[in-house]
Amino acid sequence: MVHSQLPVAAPLRLLCALLLLPSATMIPGGLSPRSVTDPDVQKAAEFAVQEYNALSTNAYYYKQLRIVEAQSQVVAGAKYYLTMELMKTKCAKTTGKPKVYKEIQNCELPPKAQQEKLTCHFQVWSRPWLEKVELTKMSCN
């Protein structure tokens, strides 16, 4: 009897050990959840909002309401996958110097009946050693 249980014991111990690993263990090249308050996530979100406003043909700026979800992936640098809520502001885009993130965040919102909220998915690729950040994907609805 004891002999027949031996082959099962080793795989069972391995399975138990794997289940005890912390859930936040990073898988190389895989997506890992990140806290929405993480400073790197915050920087990526600021960049995404600025780029969204620069690329959008809307006449008004959109500001960040909140980061809904954040994940990262270790690539040649770090890629951040962000789900964010943006809200249309009363600040009109004008020719000349575009507003920076902090200025956009200070823009007033229109009255409740006129508010337009977007849910956006952004991918931001950061390569600090090259001093380069890129918005690689963006979709909003």
Curated annotation (Swiss-Prot):
Taxonomy, superkingdom: Eukaryota
SMART domains per record: CY
Species of the source: Oxyuranus scutellatus scutellatus
Residues in Cystatin domain copies: 29-129
Chain ranges for the short sequence motif Secondary area of contact as given in the UniProt record: 73-77
Family: Belongs to the cystatin family.
Short name of any one Pfam family annotated for the protein: Cystatin
Protein name: Cystatin
Function description: Inhibits various C1 cysteine proteases including cathepsin L, papain and cathepsin B. This protein has no toxic activity and its function in the venom is unknown. It may play a role as a housekeeping or regulatory protein.
Signal peptide: 1-26
Misc note: Negative results: the recombinant protein does not inhibit calpain-1 (CAPN1), a C2 family cysteine protease and legumain (LGMN), a C13 family cysteine protease. Does not provoke cell death (PC3 prostrate cancer cells).
